[in-house]
Amino acid sequence: MIKDKEMGKKLLESIETLNEAAYELYSMVLNDNEGLDDFVKTMQALLIGIKGNVTGLVVEEPALKCNLLVDNALDTLEKLDGISEKKRKLGIIKNELIPEIGEAYVDLLFWGGCFPDPDAMFEYYNNQMKEFYPAPEKDKGRYRYDLSVAVMANTDVEQVKKCLKFLNDAVPEGLRCEYVLFNDGVGKKVAKYFDDLVDKNVKVINYKHQTNAPSVIYQLVEGKDVLFLTTENILSKTAVSNMMKCLTSDKKIGAVCPAFVEEDKLDDTEINEYLWHQKSELNTDVVLAPSNEILMPTMLGAYFPFMAKRYTEFSSKAMSLIGRRNGKLLYEAGDALACRVHKEEDEDIVLEGIKQFERIMGINPMLEQDVDQDLLSGLDFKNKEKRVDILGINSSFGINLLAIQDRVREESKNLRTNIYSLNEEEAYERDLEAIAKKGRFISDWDKDFDKCFPNARFDYIVMEKTNGKLLDLMLLLKLLERLKDGGVMAIHTAEEMPLSDYEPRKVIGDWQILYK
């Protein structure tokens, strides 16, 4: 946050004037008005003045990218001078210059005026965020495109070409589709390659300087759904169609990602709904989501910005958490395959991300996101022909419950599964609500347990975090009574517990597994 609020206010007013000038420039080009060169010079002078003031503020608040965005806008204006084709000029002003100026305004407003003050940030989230990034509009009840394919170039030009080749093969024929190609400062070769691709349904944003901020993409998409990917990824031929089928299979699904494999396993897989796995968190290097809902703009950083580095692995964690807490289901389509270039993890980014995420979202995103293989190895998932009911007790994000559900669906070809949740930890209550058919928060097991799902019987009961009350003999006996014939109860504890002589019973790692 910058200290000189008056300076910030004046700069915002200057950028607002610049934004109006950009729209006027578009009108002048459209109508073949005279005085275009002088008008552009005036805009350049205004940008240079803004840049001089903003550069000093970046020293004060390093999270700002406004100086880079202003420099990108200057580069765009210079580029216009060398273009004679009217249609191309209009495209650059509309798809590059105006969005760059809009991004500069929001950047200074939020990172200069709100971050890192939580109260100011939440004020922005609640009252301004959606105003600056409105969802695409319909025309006569219909979106302009069925699908917006948004590609963020963050690799060399050869990998960019490879990514787009696989992508073009994967986009289903017959879709009303647009492409939004975002070159985030990765060089002139990529910029030229993108410029050569400009067409009626291809929008290009060429940044001179890297910002690592794909929020600009959300200013341009006009499709019903948005497929986002970075050029580090390549897709199988059936990936997009299978992801789209998964997304539209249930109105509650908010986002879908592919399954990531090695390139030599990038097969064209037929549609297979048994491979659609509900997740607590998605990998958003490739992700498909409706354009008018909260998940895609959150992942892009247009909604709920919280971390100075912008697009990182925490973008997917933020999108997933916001999605869960808005009642949206997250799916990995196992019949949609993708391959990504290996990336080294930046420990500094991880540490900053954990700190900022926990401060704003109220939860550590790195905790308990791995499936417990010891647990799964002690359970049987075959021949489950009837409806399968799973009860989780203190299941955090529900990772293991979803893994059990996935294995039942795959191995028994059975989609009739229900997850129930009993939970003592308030921090996870809203996350569990998103995955459970029924869930209850419990503060007193003696008083409340008998009232919880009294008629339900379970194939699996999984107690992930224990305490003295949960390991009480009477409660354990009541839980065993809630198992169906052939059911199993898994308790995560290395301590001595009642029923130690119960048979049949198996101990795997820290899990004690009781079979009925």
Where are these regions (language model features)?
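N-proximal low-complexity "stem/linker" segments adjacent to membrane-targeting elements
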Residues: P116-F166
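C-terminal, non-catalytic tails of nucleotide-sugar-dependent glycosyltransferases
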Residues: Y125-D146, G254, D268-L295, L300, ...
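A conserved hydrophobic helix/loop-capping motif in glycosyltransferases and polysaccharide synthases
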Residues: L147-Q159, C163, A170, F182, ...
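Acidic donor-binding segment of Leloir-type glycosyltransferases
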Residues: L167-Y207, A436
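Active-site nucleotide-sugar/metal-binding loop of Leloir-type enzymes
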Residues: S215-D225
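Short beta-strand-to-loop acidic/aromatic patch adjacent to the donor-nucleotide binding site
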Residues: G223-I234
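Conserved donor NDP-sugar-binding/catalytic core segment of glycosyltransferases
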Residues: I234, T238-E270
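A short, conserved alpha-helix in the catalytic core of glycosyltransferases
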Residues: S291-A336
